[in-house]
Each structure stands twice: as C-alpha cells, then as structure tokens.
C-alpha cells in the first residue's frame, strides 16, 4: 500500500511539473489542416441545356445525384412561405406512385431521396443507382401535387407559426431580416398566418412549371461512376 501511495504521489508531482511548464497565456499551435482530395469533374451539356458534372470517387460503392436550379432569390409577397412547401409537395406522390409507395421503394433499397424549391437529391449504393435514378426522375417529371398534402402542410406551418409568435428569438430574427434587407426583399420578407393561408395549389403548380427547367439547372453526380455510365 505504501509503494502504491508513493507511486501516485510521484505521478501527481510529475503531472504538476508538466502543467507548470505549459504557458496558458498562448493558444496551442493548430495541427496540420486535413487534406481533402476531390476528383476532377468531367462536364458536359445535354441538348436540353442541362449542365452535368461527374466526379468519380470509388472509395465507397455509392453514387449521389443532385439537381440544382440556378435561379435568383424570388419575392413571394402575399404568398410568403410558398417555397417551403414545394419539395414536400413534389414528394407527395407521382403519376406512377403514391407517397407511401414512393417512400417504401426508397426504403427498400436503403436509398435517400429529397426535394426542395431549388433542388432534388438522391443517393444509393452503386448496385441500386438505376432504381434510385428512376425514382428521382419520377419525382422530378411526374409530381401530382395532391391538394390533401398541401392542406396538411399548411396546417403544420400554421401550428409552427403559432408556437413562435411570442418567441423572442423568432421575433428578433424576423425584425433583423426586415431591417437588414427591407420587407420587400426576398431575404427580408417573413411568412405569416395570412400569407400561408393565401397559398393555393395553383401557386405550387405555377412555381414548378416556371422554375423546374433543364436550361437553368445543373446535375452533379458524385461517386463510383464515370462519365460513360452517366
């Protein structure tokens, strides 16, 4: 026991000496920055104007596809909040699949598929790339925009707005954006209960028909795939 106590004492003493030698008035030197290696992108443009970028990376047997719309920010005005619904509406079902069928097929192959007002993204194992592309294309080209889905999203949004109505942080954020950008700027406007109620199914369809066009978009393909396969 005595040897054990002495050993602990020497350890603490040594540690104390080490700590005493550290100059805590100076920040420790940073380590070397991690090296990020990104493969060189191969690019080409389709006849419809869609720009395609392919980056081959065989580290994992996975492939991801991301379609991005290159559009300027838009002022939603008395329909503020419209763009927050677009992605969910596109994922709400297609001419070929209901929402549940779409979700089941995605889950069955362990893939991911999502959409927003400015993008559609999908990823899967390489062996399922054909299937996930089929599902992505179905969402992109054949959305049916069910009205029941829009009503559900509007109710959820109204509930969310009600919970943040008296939240100091949410109020501060809205005021800050309005002061910085102005209420009539895309970054300064805020979604309200009234603007949410103003949104109609025709607004959703009009947005989709206006902005989801190949000549203002690019498709990034990254993973275990090359230009020939793409």
What are these regions (language model features)?
Residues 47, 51, 57-59, 68-74, ...:
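Solvent-exposed coil/turn segments that connect beta secondary-structure elements
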Residues 22-24, 29, 103-207, 225-228:
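Acidic/histidine-enriched segments that form metal/cofactor-coordinating
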Residues 66-126, 189:
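M16/MPP (pitrilysin/insulinase) zinc-metallopeptidase core fold and M16-derived inactive scaffolds
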Residues 49, 67, 84, 136, ...:
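Divalent metal-coordination and catalytic microenvironments
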Residues 40-42, 46-50, 61-67, 81, ...:
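Envelope-exposed proteins and targeting segments
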Residues 4-7, 17-54, 226-230:
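Proteolytic maturation boundary segments
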